[in-house]
């Protein structure tokens, strides 16, 4: 099995798992996985595809500029430049971007603060943080319509081989050293978002102690 085929199957499996969670509303979201380092190439989801379905045109191979390596009628996902920034600046092997209701709500609630922090949740250990009173933060950036501008702002927060950024009223982009790590981190962040949204709703309908995220 060639490396390209292996990576394709890895990304297809992740796409199927995330689709089963209904995280690809209205063809939104984009996924990528690195294939080679030198030259840099990676598979990225094709634009406008229904990600609940599996086809032979789900992904295309692009270069370090986000352009298709071969002639194709397919177009890379709109936010491919964000994936480019990740692979250029880090040793990450996979990047996942999804639009969920919970991550959009959280990004709007805390968008003016530029970040949101969570503590006191066991799931934080998924990030390799084992301290009892650990706090984890995720930056929130504006949702610039001009993708090069968005990518430039996004790049300011790409500082390690694993990380995450929330784009306000848009979605979350998570990256990791490999596909397993990226998916694990995405699941952990979405758990935290969902927990906090539900906690806020409960506070509106019952007498509960005030707990900050």
UniProtKB/Swiss-Prot annotation:
Query: Which GO terms fall under molecular function for this chain's record?
Result: methylthioribulose 1-phosphate dehydratase activity; zinc ion binding
Q: Which InterPro entries match?
A: Aldolase_II/adducin_N (IPR001303), Aldolase_II/adducin_N_sf (IPR036409), MethylthioRu-1-P_deHdtase_MtnB (IPR017714)
Instruction: Name a single GO biological process.
Output: L-methionine salvage from methylthioadenosine
Gene3D superfamilies documented for this protein: Class II aldolase/adducin N-terminal domain
What this protein catalyses is: 5-(methylsulfanyl)-D-ribulose 1-phosphate = 5-methylsulfanyl-2,3-dioxopentyl phosphate + H2O
Q: Which domain of life is it from?
A: Bacteria
Q: What EC number(s) has UniProt assigned to this enzyme? A: 4.2.1.109
Which pathway does it take part in? Amino-acid biosynthesis; L-methionine biosynthesis via salvage pathway; L-methionine from S-methyl-5-thio-alpha-D-ribose 1-phosphate: step 2/6
Cofactor binding, note field: Binds 1 zinc ion per subunit.
Lyase recorded as keyword: yes
Pfam families attached to this UniProt entry: Aldolase_II
Gene Ontology, cellular component aspect = cytoplasm
Keywords attached to this entry: Amino-acid biosynthesis, Lyase, Metal-binding, Methionine biosynthesis, Zinc
Q: Which cofactor does it need?
A: Zn(2+)
Q: Where does Zn(2+) bind?
A: 97, 99
Q: Which family does it belong to?
A: Belongs to the aldolase class II family. MtnB subfamily.
Its assembly, as annotated, is: Homotetramer.
Q: What is this protein's function per UniProt?
A: Catalyzes the dehydration of methylthioribulose-1-phosphate (MTRu-1-P) into 2,3-diketo-5-methylthiopentyl-1-phosphate (DK-MTP-1-P).
Task: From the Swiss-Prot or TrEMBL record, give the protein name.
Answer: Methylthioribulose-1-phosphate dehydratase
Give the source species.
Geobacillus sp. (strain WCH70)
Which gene produces this protein? mtnB
């Amino acid at each position: 099995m060639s490396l390209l085929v292996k990576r394709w199957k890895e990304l297809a499996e992740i796409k199927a798992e995330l689709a089963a969670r209904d995280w690809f509303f209205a063809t939104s979201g984009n996924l990528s996985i690195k294939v080679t380092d030198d030259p840099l190439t990676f598979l990225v989801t094709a634009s406008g595809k229904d990600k609940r379905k599996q086809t032979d045109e789900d992904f295309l191979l692009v270069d370090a500029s986000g352009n298709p390596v071969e002639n194709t009628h397919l177009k890379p996902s709109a936010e491919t430049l964000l994936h480019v920034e990740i692979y250029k600046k880090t040793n990450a092997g996979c990047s996942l971007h999804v639009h969920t209701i919970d991550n959009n709500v959280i990004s709007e609630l805390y968008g003016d603060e530029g970040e949101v922090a969570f503590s006191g949740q066991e799931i934080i250990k998924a990030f390799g943080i084992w301290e009892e009173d650990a706090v984890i933060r995720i930056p929130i950036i504006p949702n610039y319509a001009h993708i090069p501008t968005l990518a430039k702002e996004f790049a300011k927060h790409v500082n390690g081989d694993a990380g995450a950024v929330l784009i306000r009223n848009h979605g979350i982009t998570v990256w990791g050293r490999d596909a397993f790590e990226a998916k694990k981190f995405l699941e952990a962040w979405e758990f935290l978002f969902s927990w906090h949204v539900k906690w806020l709703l409960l506070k509106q309908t019952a007498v509960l102690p005030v707990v900050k995220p």
